[in-house]
Structures are given as structure tokens and as C-alpha cells.
Amino acid sequence: GFVYQTEHYFDLTGSLSYIAAILLAISTHPYLDLRGSVISAFILIWAARLGTFLFLRVKKDGKDSRFDEIKTRFFRFMFTWTLGGAWVFITMAAGLAAITSTNQTPIGIFFYAGIVLWIFGFTIEVIADRQKRAFRSDTTNKGRFITSGLWSMSRHPNYFGEIILWIGISVMAFPALVGWQYLTLISPLFVVFLLIKVSGVKLLEESGLKRWGNDSDYQEYLAKTPVLMPSIRRS
């Protein structure tokens, strides 16, 4: 990516890696039960949807603003691509452990609670992405920031949804884990760390301040709207 200084295939490559890892786990594991099947399906659905959405977005926009500064610095750009590999493996570690586990415990409350969390998180992420895409597609909004829909309750509702859906995967996976596999429950914590401190939120907050930091409306939006956890805006 650095030779061409392009980030066009970053998210697509990551999504295809998720899909390949899940398909490999399914094809090599003879004990796939209902829990493993649902976790596999959910990760495949998420990866296919997000990968396609982000790839088409960067192709239409011509760039991903998160990478504006990163891609001009070799070591930081290389670190970002390397971190992408860790992103894939650690993020779905709990899911992979459950899919390949031989500990076929009965389906119970954790399974159904995880499904509810995943559907809730996935729905929020999809709606938030569509709302922002529709906002940016309206030429009258060029150069403006979105404050409508879910974006009126959170500055990054899409990332909130992603965190919740991965918590759902870990909750579903939990009963099937044994021994060292419990370490994979770090997965949702890694997602939180990555989205807040390394990628998404951190980069977009910095970018937003550079673009609209002197805008009184933006300052009001920052003051009244939570960074991540949605809430009704304070008047």
C-alpha cells in the first residue's frame, strides 16, 4: 500500500481475511454445532456487509480521510497495515475459539443474549452508516457535519454498534470456551481499544477538530453529544 500511498484496499483486505478465516475454521472442524454455526454466519454477514460498504465508499470518495496523514509516513502506514492483521485475529478470537471448540455445551441464556446483542449492534451500525452516507450524498451538505438521526445521540454511533455486536459474539462464545480459550474474551476489549484509541474515533475526532474546531455549531455539538454511548441530546 505505501508504494502507491493508497488505503483503498485496507478495509476490503481485512474483511476478506475475516471471511477466509471463518471458512477455513468451518471446513476443518468436524464438530460445528448450532452455536458455532450462528457465530460463523454472524461474522460472515458482518464482514461482507462492512467490507463492501467501506470499499465502495472509499472508491466513491476517492480516499479515506482517516488515512490522510498516516499514508504519507512509511512506518506509521506500515504499522497500520500490520495492526490490521492483529485486528482480524484478536477481534474474532472468541468466535473462532467457540467455532473450533469440542466443548459442545447446551444452548442457553448466553447464546440468546448474545444473539440479541449482535442484532442490536449490527442494526445500529448499519443504520448509522446509511444515515451518514445519505447525508454525504446530498450536495447541499458538502463541508458540513452530520447531527441528525443516530448521529444526534452519539458522535460515533456506528462504532458503538460495532462494539456491541462483538460483545454479542463473545457472550455467545463464552459457554463453549475451556482453559486457555477464556483468554480470547479479550476480543471486545481489543475492539474498544482499537476503535477509541487507535483508529476510528481518535482519527475522526482529530480530523473533525481540524475542519470545524472554530465552528460554534460544532463546538456545541461536541458539548452536547456523547462521543460513543448514545443519549438524548441535552438542550
Feature roles, as predicted:
Residues 6, 52, 72-74, 92-99:
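Intramembrane alpha-helical segments
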Residues 42, 54-66:
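Membrane-helix interface/capping segments
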Residues 2, 17-48, 88-131, 136-235:
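Hydrophobic transmembrane alpha-helices
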